Every structure is written in structure tokens, then in C-alpha cells.
Amino acid sequence: MTKLMNRDEFRAALENAIKGKSANKAPFSVAWATGRLSRAHLARWAENHYHYVGPFADYLGYLYARTPAHMVEAKDFLLANMYEEEIGGDRHTDLLIRFAEACGTTKERVIDPDNMSPTTRGLQAWCYSVAMREDPVVAVAGLVVGLESQVPSSYRKQTPTV
């Protein structure tokens, strides 16, 4: 039987698995980082990103409810992440709305679920599905390591051009 990895080994293996697949290398991210996007592009991005980021605490809440009670550290991690998403400092959705408005769109367009693109709707559905159906370890790997952990490095590359 294969030996289970400890937490640090598992995290390193996950990070190695996504190397070379970073959101930083996506054409949109590259265009943003090099200053080739218009305010209209950024407004549309914010209108869509809101619908992925907005329910992130909900995804984590579903996952928290399904995480076995004996996984206390994992449950604490999920609670801390939910707190940070919703209460700890500026709410991410509020920041997105302000950014979107600065780019020329309205709060009404940002929060309107009928305004999100089919791709964003698919990403949101995938996030809910993973949170509700996958093993908690798989769900954390996909949602937190695979998606959420890429956002800060993307923003570091994009912020100077804004």
C-alpha cells in the first residue's frame, strides 16, 4: 500500500501539479499585466469575476458541513477562510464592485446573475459541485489550492498596470 503524504508533502505535490498551468499565463492575464486591456475589458472581467468570487464562502460552507468532525484543523482552516472572505477586512465582492464602477460599469450590472458569461456560470457550477460532492480533501485541493491560491499572484502581476 502506498504511504499517505503528510500535509506539507501533499500541499507541495498539489502545487507541483499546477505548475505550468498558472492563471498568470492565460492570454487574458498576460494582456492585463502588459497593459493591453481597455477599461471596458476590465469592467466585463469584474462583472464576471464577482460571480465566481462572490459565493466563495458558500462553497467553503458546504465543504465545512461535509468535513468529518475529527478533521479539526481542516474545519478550522475552512472557518478562517470563510471569515476572511466575508468579514476579515474589505469584503472581496465590495472591492470588485468598486473596481468595476471605476472601469465604467454599474453595481447593478455586476451583481446581476443574468449578466455573467456562460463560462463564468460553468466555473461557478463546478465550484458548487466540487464543494458539495467531492471528498473534502479533493474539494480543498481544487477550490483552495487549484483556484483561490492563484489569485494573489495574478493580482501582483496585474496591479501595476491598473
Please provide the spans of the model-predicted regions.
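Intrinsically disordered, low-complexity regions
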Residues: M1-T2, T34
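Alpha-helical bundle segments that constitute or directly flank the non-heme di-iron/ferroxidase center
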Residues: A17-A23, W32, R36-A69, E84-R91, ...
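Active-site-proximal alpha-helical scaffolds that flank and shape metal-associated catalytic sites
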Residues: T2, R7-R11, E73-V162
